[in-house]
């Protein structure tokens, strides 16, 4: 809840900026100015960097010398208040991007979210540089040695943080609906934050977390470039990147690099930057289609029973955000060859049922578990299959809030293959014809409404006309359309045979 609330806050006040949201409330006390933070570089363009707060400061890892005494500037940051629409009946409407979508909505109530007045503390960077000018990094420091073992992490120093000034409560509101004649139920979650003026908290069954005043909800860092002899530089300019000077280039994955290089997405722009489309709004989809057919080939050659089992586990994961985050962390650590405390903690927080699903998924994609739970003693028996699964999971984990719920609903409705066909057709000229037999399931108004909401979460606005649909990109970025294309392609590869059987069965019984 806390992670989602802080993430939503930054989307509104610092979209595309340099601030980082705090993911765990327990990390708030660790976030002191000049604390060390590691930034884990990711492999694919849509993956956001991961950050870990270390139990050390910059002073702790420097050689002896003049003690760092940072000059701290404190100021008002912003008074954060946000209004959103919640629907008070079972049927849900939703507002995504610039498009308002309603499927049987029966009234809207306006809710209010607020962290209240926020304060910013910031280090005087120029003074810090002067104080550290003759200092070097102690490369024998235990903390530094552990960071170097990770091979693809950047050492950073915390230079600013954003804090609350009053007590807040974070609540989660679950909205439910039944659609398509009761065939499926959809539950979407919204996070609401309320600041309390006098310190009192109103009891509410939806309140799940209370955060005190002076809680850090976001922070800013500055990367360091550390040379082999311990000399280091502060990376002040936008294009200047930190890291460690190595005698030889190290691969960013621990497993067979060839298993990962088959995924042809390494030369695209960083996930935080927009990819402008000049040759059509869904040009990136057309570019990626052939690559994805090759990338998901290991799924295509699996035995039908294994395909179906993997697809069934994935359906559970799509409706369980906590399980998806834990699975992505585990896959990330397996690929990196070094288990992190985040993976261990994520698995410990899972229920027995969630752990069973996580274990089942890993075993189905070529991961051999030696003990009771996944751990560093395990090994990957089929690297291409595991790389393919990690590729899909990484894309699912980067989908916006509630998008995986809509995707899971489409799996239940057996329309994944239709959605792939729809996306391909739209990538040609932004318009598709519903006379195409593969698109027949989408002629249903309620099914199309769910598809609209899924596509809107990927910044694609679908407009339905009498016998066709038209697509418009909502933002000048192709990252979310690319992620949607990857997830649909992976799920379609696993479910295609099953959906074809259902389609043939439907025709045999005279159903549409």
Swiss-Prot record:
One Gene Ontology cellular component term attached to this UniProt record is: membrane
Spell out which residues are annotated as carrying S-(2-succinyl)cysteine: 45, 156, 168, 180, 235, 411, 420
What does UniProt note about where in the body, tissue by tissue, this protein is expressed? Expressed in spleen, kidney, large and small intestine, testicle, stomach and by CD4(+)CD(8+) T cells in thymus. Expressed by macrophages.
Q: Which InterPro entries match?
A: Gasdermin_pore (IPR040460), Gasdermin_PUB (IPR041263), GSDME (IPR042377)
State the UniProt keywords alphabetically. Cell membrane, Cytoplasm, Isopeptide bond, Lipoprotein, Membrane, Necrosis, Palmitate, Transmembrane, Transmembrane beta strand, Ubl conjugation
Where is the site described as Cleavage found in this chain?
A: 270-271
Chain residue numbers at which the record places covalent cross-link Glycyl lysine isopeptide (Lys-Gly) (interchain with G-Cter in ubiquitin): 120, 189
PTM remark:
Cleavage at Asp-270 by CASP3 (mature and uncleaved precursor forms) or granzyme B (GZMB) relieves autoinhibition and is sufficient to initiate pyroptosis.
Keyword Cytoplasm attached: yes
Null mutant: what phenotype?
Answer: Mutant mice develop normally, including the immune system. After injection of the chemotherapy drug cisplatin, they look more healthy and vigorous than wild type.
- Outline the segment boundaries, as ranges, of region: Membrane targeting domain: 1-56
Short name of any one Pfam family annotated for the protein: Gasdermin
Give the GO biological process terms. cellular response to tumor necrosis factor; cellular response to virus; inner ear auditory receptor cell differentiation; negative regulation of cell population proliferation; positive regulation of immune response to tumor cell; positive regulation of intrinsic apoptotic signaling pathway; positive regulation of MAPK cascade; programmed cell death
Domain of life of the native organism: Eukaryota
> Which GO MF terms does the UniProt record name?
cardiolipin binding; phosphatidylinositol-4,5-bisphosphate binding; wide pore channel activity
User: Anything noted about its domains?
Assistant: Intramolecular interactions between N- and C-terminal domains may be important for autoinhibition in the absence of activation signal. The intrinsic pyroptosis-inducing activity is carried by the N-terminal domain, that is released upon cleavage by CASP3 or granzyme B (GZMB).
Q: Write down the PANTHER family for this protein, in alphabetical order.
A: GASDERMIN-E (PTHR15207:SF1), NONSYNDROMIC HEARING IMPAIRMENT PROTEIN (PTHR15207)
Give the record's family classification.
Belongs to the gasdermin family.
Name the UniProt record assigns to this protein: Gasdermin-E
Q: Organism, per UniProt?
A: Mus musculus (Mouse)
Q: Which gene encodes it?
A: Gsdme
């Amino acid at each position: 809840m806390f992670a989602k609330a802080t993430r939503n806050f930054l989307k509104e006040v610092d979209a595309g900026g340099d601030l980082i949201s705090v993911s765990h409330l327990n990390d708030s006390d660790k976030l002191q100015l000049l604390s060390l933070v590691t930034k884990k570089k990711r492999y694919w363009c849509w993956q956001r960097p991961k950050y870990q707060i270390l139990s050390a400061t910059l002073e702790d890892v420097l050689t002896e010398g003049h003690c760092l005494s940072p000059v701290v500037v404190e100021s008002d940051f912003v008074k954060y208040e946000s209004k959103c629409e919640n629907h008070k009946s079972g049927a849900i409407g939703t507002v995504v991007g610039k498009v308002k979508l309603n499927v049987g909505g029966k009234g809207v109530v306006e809710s209010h979210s607020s962290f209240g007045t926020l304060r910013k503390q910031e280090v005087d960077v120029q003074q810090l540089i002067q104080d550290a000018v003759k200092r070097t990094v102690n490369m024998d420091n235990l903390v530094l040695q552990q960071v170097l073992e990770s091979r693809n992490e950047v050492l950073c120093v915390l230079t600013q943080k954003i804090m609350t000034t009053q007590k807040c409560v974070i609540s989660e509101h679950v909205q439910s609906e039944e659609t398509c004649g009761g065939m499926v139920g959809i539950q979407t979650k919204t996070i609401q934050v309320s600041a309390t003026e006098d310190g009192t908290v109103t009891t509410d069954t939806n309140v799940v977390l209370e955060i005190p005043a002076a809680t850090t909800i976001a922070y800013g860092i500055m990367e360091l470039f550390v040379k082999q002899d311990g000399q280091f530089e502060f990376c002040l300019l936008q294009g200047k990147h930190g890291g460690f000077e190595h005698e030889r280039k190290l691969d960013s994955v621990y497993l067979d690099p060839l298993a990962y290089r088959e995924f042809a997405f390494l030369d695209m722009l960083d996930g935080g930057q927009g990819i402008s489309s000049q040759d059509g709004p869904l040009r990136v989809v057309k570019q990626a289609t052939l690559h994805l057919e090759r990338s998901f080939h290991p799924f295509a050659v699996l035995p039908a029973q294994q395909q179906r089992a993997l697809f069934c586990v994935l359906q559970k994961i799509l409706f369980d955000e906590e399980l998806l985050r834990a699975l992505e962390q585990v896959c990330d650590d397996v690929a990196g060859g070094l288990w992190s405390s985040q993976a261990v903690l994520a698995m410990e927080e899972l229920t027995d049922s969630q752990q069973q699903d996580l274990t089942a998924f890993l075993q189905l994609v070529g991961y051999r578990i030696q003990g009771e739970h996944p751990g560093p003693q395990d090994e990957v028996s089929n690297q291409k299959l595991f790389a393919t699964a990690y590729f899909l999971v990484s894309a699912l984990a980067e989908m916006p809030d509630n998008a995986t719920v809509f995707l899971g609903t489409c799996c239940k409705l057996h329309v994944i293959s239709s959605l792939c066909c729809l996306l391909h057709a739209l990538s040609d000229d932004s318009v598709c014809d519903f006379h195409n037999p593969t698109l027949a399931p989408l002629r249903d108004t309620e099914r199309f409404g769910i598809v609209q909401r899924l596509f809107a979460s990927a910044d694609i606005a679908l407009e339905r006309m009498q016998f066709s649909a038209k697509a418009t990109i909502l933002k000048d970025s192709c990252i979310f359309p690319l992620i949607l294309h990857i997830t649909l392609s992976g799920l379609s590869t696993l479910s295609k045979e099953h959906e074809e059987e259902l389609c043939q069965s439907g025709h045999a019984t005279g159903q549409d």
